């Protein structure tokens, strides 16, 4: 301790280091009185830069994790009763998305998901499941869904029409030739009566009967195309024997007047006119 004599009052003024320490502690508690060091300034600027780069809505605390962007799987339409999309069945994706007009089953690779269709041994089989391979009731269906009796998926490709006949239930395609109209030739079956009478077939390539070409020499058309009278005394008859189309005897001009009309699908039509009714 130091003793200081004051010239004014000749009194002792004792000084100690305690006020100085108090001043120092008070100045240390004041933030404005402390100037940060260069290392502290660099650290604070680095933390501020990292906070600025952090996306909005996330926390910088160590305990919280940043949410990741969830990638939602693309949805495809399910259309029961419509053929399956060939591109989706083969590759598992479809570029048309919800605009595609075909069906996109739950499992494009085929097979049955046991979690979707219950197996109930002893119950009757679900007819809708056996036919289409799907059941709209899912696990609530009360019938059996055997996985080994799924129907074979029919896949349609946007290509040209196949010239083969595909019988249901057969693994190999039955090769069937087509006539000049695109109708099937089946020599071992009966003649298509619709085609024989009208020259066309409403069933097309799916018809199970024979459609011979009109110019074949060994086929005989057993039916006549008779129509109502166009005018009094005028009738139309068709020449049905294809083997003798060019060998038909023409009546003499003394009895009849022969007028050739036209040739339609191999038929030669003639108008037999009575000379008394002719103009």
UniProtKB/Swiss-Prot annotation:
**Biased amino acid composition, Low complexity:** 16-39
Write out the GO MF terms: DNA binding; mRNA binding; zinc ion binding
Pfam families given for it? zf-CCCH
Q: Which domain of life is it from?
A: Eukaryota
Q: Which InterPro entries match?
A: Plant_ZF_CCCH, Znf_CCCH, Znf_CCCH_sf
Question: Keyword set for this entry?
Answer: DNA-binding, Metal-binding, Repeat, Zinc, Zinc-finger
Region Disordered, as annotated, extends over: 11-77
Keyword Transport present in the record's keywords: the answer is no
- Start and end residues of each C3H1-type zinc finger? 79-107, 120-148, 186-214
Gene3D superfamilies for the chain: 2.30.30.1190, Zinc finger, CCCH-type
* Residue ranges crossing the lipid bilayer per the database entry: none
PANTHER family (alphabetical): PROTEIN PHOSPHATASE RELATED, ZINC FINGER CCCH DOMAIN-CONTAINING PROTEIN 26
- UniProt protein name: Zinc finger CCCH domain-containing protein 42
């Amino acid at each position: 301790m130091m003793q200081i004599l004051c010239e004014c009052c000749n009194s002792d003024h004792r000084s100690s280091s305690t006020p100085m320490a108090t001043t120092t502690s008070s100045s240390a508690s004041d933030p404005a009185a402390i100037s940060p060091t260069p290392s502290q300034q660099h650290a604070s600027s680095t933390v501020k830069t990292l906070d600025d780069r952090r996306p909005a809505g996330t926390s910088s605390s160590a305990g919280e994790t940043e949410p990741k962007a969830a990638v939602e799987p693309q949805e495809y339409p399910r259309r029961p009763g419509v053929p399956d999309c060939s591109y989706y069945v083969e590759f598992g994706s479809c570029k048309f998305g919800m605009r595609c007009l075909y069906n996109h089953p739950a499992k494009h690779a085929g097979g049955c998901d046991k979690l979707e269709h219950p197996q109930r041994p002893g119950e009757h089989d679900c007819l809708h499941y056996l036919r289409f391979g799907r059941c709209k009731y899912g696990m609530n269906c009360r019938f059996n869904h055997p996985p080994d009796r799924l129907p074979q998926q029919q896949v349609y490709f946007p290509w040209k029409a196949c010239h083969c006949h595909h019988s249901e239930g057969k693994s190999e395609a039955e090769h069937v030739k087509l006539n000049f109209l695109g109708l099937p030739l089946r020599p071992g079956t009966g003649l298509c009566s619709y085609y024989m009478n009208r020259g066309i077939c409403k069933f097309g390539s799916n018809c199970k009967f024979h459609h011979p070409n009109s110019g074949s020499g060994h086929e005989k058309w057993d039916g006549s195309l008779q129509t109502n009278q166009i005018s009094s005394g005028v009738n139309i008859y068709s020449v049905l024997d294809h083997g003798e189309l060019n060998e038909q005897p023409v009546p003499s001009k003394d009895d009849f007047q022969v007028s050739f009309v036209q040739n339609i699908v191999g038929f030669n039509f003639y108008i037999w006119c009575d000379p008394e009714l002719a103009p």
